[in-house]
Amino acid sequence: MSEGVEAIVANDNGTDQVNGNRTGKDNEEHDGSTGSNLSNFLWHGGSVWDAWFSCASNQVAQVLLTLPYSFSQLGMLSGIVLQIFYGLLGSWTAYLISVLYVEYRARKEKEGKSFKNHVIQWFEVLDGLLGSYWKALGLAFNCTFLLFGSVIQLIACASNIYYINDHLDKRTWTYIFGACCATTVFIPSFHNYRIWSFLGLGMTTYTAWYLAIASIIHGQAEGVKHSGPTKLVLYFTGATNILYTFGGHAVTVEIMHAMWKPQKFKYIYLMATLYVFTLTIPSAAAVYWAFGDALLDHSNAFSLMPKNAWRDAAVILMLIHQFITFGFACTPLYFVWEKVIGMHDTKSICLRALARLPVVIPIWFLAIIFPFFGPINSAVGALLVSFTVYIIPSLAHMLTYRSASARQNAAEKPPFFMPSWTAMYVLNAFVVVWVLIVGFGFGGWASVTNFVRQVDTFGLFAKCYQCKPAAAAAHAPVSALHHRL
C-alpha cells in the first residue's frame, strides 16, 4: 500500500503522537487570518466534539425510517429491548476498535514510524497486530460492508424523494441521486466533515421527532393491530435490522485518525449511542403505535405519514443527510482505492476526485439491481455487519492480548468498569458467540429468506419498489392516500 501524503487535507494530526504530548492541532495555529480561521472552523475538524457528531450522524441515518418496520416484525417490547442491547454491544466493539487502533499506533511509533503522511485504516491495524491473513479478512468484510452501506443510502434517497415527487419512478431517482452522491469524491477526508456532521445530526433529529410527534397527533389508525411477533423469519429479520442500525462503526479508525488526540475517542461512540437512543426509540415506538401491522408492507415510515409541509421538510432533510452518510461510507473506500492505484499522494484535488469515481459506479449499479429498501438492511446486517464490527473486533482484541507480555505492555488497560482481563475475554467471547449464532445464523437465514421473497415478488431491477399502482392511485380517495404507498 502506498504511504502517500494526504496533500489536499490540512495536516491536522501531522504531529500527533499517541506516546507523546504534541497534537496536530498545533499545525492549525499558524495563520490568524479571518478567512483561514473561518475555513478551519467549518472545514477542518479534529476535536472530541467533531468525532461525536461524526459518530452520531453516521449511526442514525436512513435507519430511522426502517425501524418502525422492524418494530412491526418484532413487537414493541422486543424492539425497544433489542435497540438498547445492540446499542450497548455496538458501543463495546467500537471501544475495542479504538483500543486496537491506539495499540497499533503506539507500537509503530515506538519503532519510529510516523503517520504524518498516511491515513490509517482498519485493515492496516489488523495487519500490524495480527498479520496478513487478518488484513485480508478485515479488508474484504469492511470494504464489502461499506460498499453496500453506500448502496443502502442511495436506495433510501430514491425511496424518500418519491414521496414528494412521484412523477418519476424510484429507479429514475436512483440515477439522479447516484450522480449527486458522486460529488462526494471532492471531500478529502473525515477532517472535512465538520460542518456536515453537525448539520446531518440536526436534520436527523428533526426527522426523528417529526415522526414521533406526527404519529401521536395522527393517533391510531382505524382498526390498527399490533400482532408482532408472528413469524420467526420476520422476528429475526427485524432483529438484524437493529443489529445493522448499531453497527455503523466500520469507519471508527478513519474518524479516530482525523482527531487531533485520537486516544480520547474511547467512550465517544457510547455517548453518541445514548443520544441516538433519544431519536430511534421514541420515533419507532410512536409510528408502530399509530400504524401497527400496516408497517409490514410499508418499510419506509414516510409512506404512512400524512402529506404536508412538515413531512416534505423531513424528507428533504433526510435526503441531504443521506448524501452526507453516503460520503461517510464511501470515504474509506476512496482511500483504499487510492492506495491500490497509487494515487493517494496526488496533490491535485481534481485528479484525486477523478481517480475516485470508479468506486461510485458499482454502488450505483447495485442500487438499481436491488432497490429493496428495508429488507436489504437486514441482509447486510446479518451477512456483513455481524462480522465486520462485532465478531472480528472481538476476536482481534482477544488474540492481540492473548500473551501475558502483551497485556502487561498494553497501551490501554481494561476500562474502569471491567475488573480484569478475564472479564474482557468473557465479554468478547459472549459477543462472538451471540452474534455468530443469533445475528449471522438465525438473522442470516431470516433476512436472506425475506430478501429472496422480495426478489421473487418484485424482481431484480424493480422499476418502482413498493410503489402504489397507478390505477389504484387515480381512484383512491384523498384521505385514504395517507395510509398508502
Curated annotation (Swiss-Prot):
Keywords: Amino-acid transport, Auxin signaling pathway, Cell membrane, Membrane, Symport, Transmembrane, Transmembrane helix, Transport. Changing S215F: In aux1-111; agravitropism. Its main location: membrane. It is a multi-pass membrane protein. It is found in: Cell membrane. One of its GO terms (cellular component) is cell surface. Residues 78-79, 157-172, 218-232, 288-314, 378, 447-485 are extracellular. Residues 12-22 have a biased composition (Polar residues). Changing G79R: In aux1-110; resistance to 2,4-D. Changing M305R: In aux1-102; agravitropism. Residues 1-59, 101-135, 194-196, 254-266, 336-356, 400-425 are cytoplasmic. Residues 23-32 have a biased composition (Basic and acidic residues). Coiled coil: none annotated. Changing A272V: In aux1-2; resistance to 2,4-D, lower growth rate of roots and hypocotyls, partial gravitropism. Expressed in root and shoot apical tissues. In root apex, confined to stele initials, protophloem poles, statolith-containing S2 columella cells, lateral root cap cells (LRC), and in epidermal cells from the distal elongation zone (DEZ) up to central elongation zone (CEZ). Auxin uptake mediated by AUX1 is inhibited by chromosaponin-1 (CSI), 1-naphthoxyacetic acid (1-NOA) and 3-chloro-4-hydroxyphenylacetic acid (CHPAA). Carrier protein involved in proton-driven auxin influx. Mediates the formation of auxin gradient from developing leaves (site of auxin biosynthesis) to tips by contributing to the loading of auxin in vascular tissues and facilitating acropetal (base to tip) auxin transport within inner tissues of the root apex, and basipetal (tip to base) auxin transport within outer tissues of the root apex. Unloads auxin from the mature phloem to deliver the hormone to the root meristem via the protophloem cell files. This is Auxin transporter protein 1.
